[in-house]
From Swiss-Prot:
Stated name of the protein: Chorismate synthase
Functional note: This reaction introduces a second double bond into the aromatic ring system.
Co-factor: note: Reduced FMN (FMNH(2)).
Cofactor dependence: FMNH2
GO cellular component: cytosol
Catalytic class of the enzyme: lyase
Coiled coil: none
HAMAP family reported for this sequence: Chorismate_synth
Subunit structure: Homotetramer.
CDD domains: Chorismate_synthase
Keywords noted in UniProt: Amino-acid biosynthesis, Aromatic amino acid biosynthesis, FAD, Flavoprotein, FMN, Lyase, NADP
Gene3D superfamilies from the UniProt entry: Chorismate synthase AroC
Organism field: Shewanella frigidimarina (strain NCIMB 400)
Pfam families: Chorismate_synt
Length: 364
């Protein structure tokens, strides 16, 4: 398995499985001198970790991260940063019944066919448990981005099933278990999720993530465009089936006169492009949306097959999220942060001495 790393100058490599001894990651390329403690990462890990509300999986993991290397006297040294989180609440016996059975909608079948074997305990490497390390690495990037460049990243649950946010109040996001920006919809969300649990089913979601303070110039055309790398990173999150930058698929019904983001020295008139033009950041907020499919592990019976090719009806046992979108908010933030961090370092390496006679467009 070779696809365990992301980035060129800021490189994050993760390892570990859902029911293994531990999860870990190596961060290469973090500049020296950044003040970094466990607490800097723990906040986002606590936002992602399981068992924190009745709307998520009942699996309880402390997700306490340990810094193994790359930090001395509270500051990064410029060497590889090693991070580790131990798994403490595995119940592998919950999965003994599916040892020789493929769960429909999961990676069981494709992993078996590709590698000739699979870790059936909680999905092994394909489990969203792996994303804990992405969040830890993303927290390092988020701190650098904010402290050195003034870039801030915020994500929120924009839609859960049929319920979408009508108003966006960023102050509400951390005040509820849904990371939802519209307080008027919280009661409806709670009622919907309670009904979903009773039915044994699951539901999909849409997440919006945005970065403010991003300077002009990030992105490496043509194949490493900023929006292409953002889409690549976000699409790599478990259960994500769609990514939009800016207006995304909404541009299909737009006319050129509607979606061209008129500009003046004082600022852009709109941000349909999501802060990226020609694969390069424009200085506007970088905005992306992701669609996550409903959890496939549900207690509603469904047809599947065994390793031997026999057809069966099955119910997936274990502890699962009825909506993976709720805990995916900090994951989306982390992946956007990792991409922006990587592109900042790449831009600095090639273009830090570049000057332009054109004034930078302001922010309205």
């Amino acid at each position: 398995m070779s696809g365990n790393s992301i980035g060129q100058n800021f490189v994050v490599t993760t390892f570990g499985e859902s029911h293994g001894v531990a999860l870990g990651c190596i961060i290469d390329g973090c500049p020296p001198g950044l003040e970094l403690t466990v607490e800097d990462m723990q906040h986002d890990l606590d936002r992602r970790r399981p068992g924190t509300s009745r709307y998520t999986t009942a699996r309880r993991e402390a997700d306490e991260v340990r810094i193994l290397s790359g930090v001395f006297e509270g500051k990064t040294t410029g060497t590889s940063i090693g991070l580790l989180i131990e798994n403490t609440d595995q119940r592998s016996q919950d999965y003994s019944d599916i040892k020789d059975t493929f769960r429909p909608g999961h990676a069981d079948y494709t992993y078996q066919q590709k590698y000739g074997m699979r870790d059936y305990r909680g999905g092994g490497r394909s489990s969203a448990r792996e994303t804990a390390m992405r969040v830890a690495a993303g927290a390092v990037a988020k701190k650098y981005l904010k402290q050195v460049h003034g870039i801030e990243i915020h994500g929120y649950l924009a839609q859960l099933g049929p319920i979408s946010a009508d108003t966006i109040d960023l102050t509400q996001i951390e005040q509820n278990a849904f990371f939802f920006p519209d307080a008027s919809k919280l009661e409806a969300l709670d009622e919907y999720m309670r009904g979903l649990r009773k039915s044994g089913d699951s539901i999909g979601a849409k997440i919006t993530v945005a970065a403010t303070g991003v300077p002009v110039g990030l992105g490496e055309p043509v194949f490493d465009r900023l929006d292409a790398d953002i889409a690549h990173a976000l699409m790599g999150i478990n259960a994500v089936k769609g990514v939009e930058i800016g207006d995304g698929f909404g541009v299909v019904t737009q006319k050129g006169s509607q979606g061209r983001d008129l500009m003046s020295p004082q600022g852009f008139a709109s941000n349909h492009a999501g802060g990226v033009l020609g694969g390069i950041s424009s200085g506007q907020p970088v905005v992306a949306h992701i669609a996550l499919k409903p959890t496939s592990s549900i207690s509603v019976p469904g047809q599947s097959m065994t390793v031997q090719g026999e057809t069966i009806d099955m119910i997936t046992k274990g502890r699962h999220d009825p909506c993976v979108g709720i805990r995916a908010v900090p994951i989306a933030e982390a992946m956007l942060a990792i991409v922006l961090m990587d592109h900042l370092l790449r831009h600095r390496a090639q273009n830090q001495d570049v000057t332009s006679q054109t004034p930078v467009i302001g922010m309205r």
